[in-house]
Swiss-Prot record:
Belongs to the bacterial ribosomal protein bL31 family. Type A subfamily. One of its GO terms (cellular component) is ribonucleoprotein complex. Its cofactor is Zn(2+). Binds the 23S rRNA. This is Large ribosomal subunit protein bL31. It comes from Desulforamulus reducens (strain ATCC BAA-1160 / DSM 100696 / MI-1) (Desulfotomaculum reducens). Transmembrane segments: none annotated. Zn(2+) binds at residues 16, 18, 36, 39.
Amino acid sequence: MKEKIHPNYQEVEVKCVCGNTFKTGSTKKEIKVEICSNCHPFYTGAQRQIEVGGRAEKFRKKYGLK
């Protein structure tokens, strides 16, 4: 490898909008994220359950058919 051509890899702090912070390695000076594992619905269990029917189900519901 050539010397002095590679970016400096350092430990940085990742900051989420929810206030959670953690450390990781990066070539950037700081990292800001909008969502992390602390506030993501998949990890928190606060997922919304959506019942989605197909087009046929929508038609049946609209016209009162079985």
